[in-house]
């Protein structure tokens, strides 16, 4: 998604050169062991929601003259980190349901933090019936090595949007305390 226009297109979030040049004869195999660290902001793919439009894959490309199939895409399963999962669980305990997830092109800015990979993920939560003054809540995470920043876009009926931010350390989080804090912070 970009502005008001929705489309699907790939967004490269990192590149890693894997191997130098080598010769490969017919019927010969070549192994190239590797280990890599995904960017902290890699979008989550493993979410329990109605519409998950998030896909992350490892795209491999070999520079082979006249190759029939020199490309490959291997899907990756990206799970929420413990702070992300704590926020999702706390919002569910506040009476919200995770409805959809997508990735938007651009940079996310929230007070003292900003995204760095050229895109950011939005998780859309919708209220259960008893939270009738809320249209939706959009949540985006910007994770660093030290903490996870959260940007909340609160869309209220008849009152428009407003934003709140929260930063969580990468230490165990008490869900009951976080739930109470989010209720107050977001006016739930």
Cite the ranges covered by each PLM segment:
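Compositionally biased low-complexity segments at domain edges in trafficked proteins
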Residues: 89-115
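A beta-strand/beta-hairpin structural motif
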Residues: 6-48
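Internal, hydrophobic beta-strand segments that form the core of beta-sheet-rich folds
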Residues: 35-41, 48-67
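C-terminal interaction module
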Residues: 107-188
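Short beta-strand elements
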Residues: 65-92
């Amino acid at each position: 998604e970009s502005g008001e226009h929705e489309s699907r297109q790939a967004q490269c979030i990192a590149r890693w050169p894997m191997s130098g040049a080598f010769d490969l004869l017919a019927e010969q195999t070549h192994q190239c062991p590797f280990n890599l660290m995904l960017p902290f902001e890699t979008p989550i793919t493993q979410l329990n929601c109605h519409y998950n439009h998030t896909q992350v894959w490892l795209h491999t490309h070999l520079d082979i003259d006249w190759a029939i199939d020199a490309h490959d895409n291997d899907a990756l399963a990206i799970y929420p980190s413990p702070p992300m999962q704590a926020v999702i669980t706390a919002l569910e305990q506040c009476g919200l349901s995770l409805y959809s997830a997508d990735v938007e092109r651009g940079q996310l800015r929230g007070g003292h933090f900003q995204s760095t990979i050229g895109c950011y993920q939005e998780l859309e939560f919708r209220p259960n019936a008893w939270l009738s003054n809320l249209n939706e809540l959009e949540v985006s995470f910007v994770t660093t090595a030290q903490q996870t920043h959260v940007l909340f876009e609160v869309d209220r009926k008849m009152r428009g949007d407003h934003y709140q931010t929260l930063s969580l350390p990468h230490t165990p989080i008490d869900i009951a305390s976080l739930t109470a804090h989010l209720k107050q912070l977001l006016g739930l």
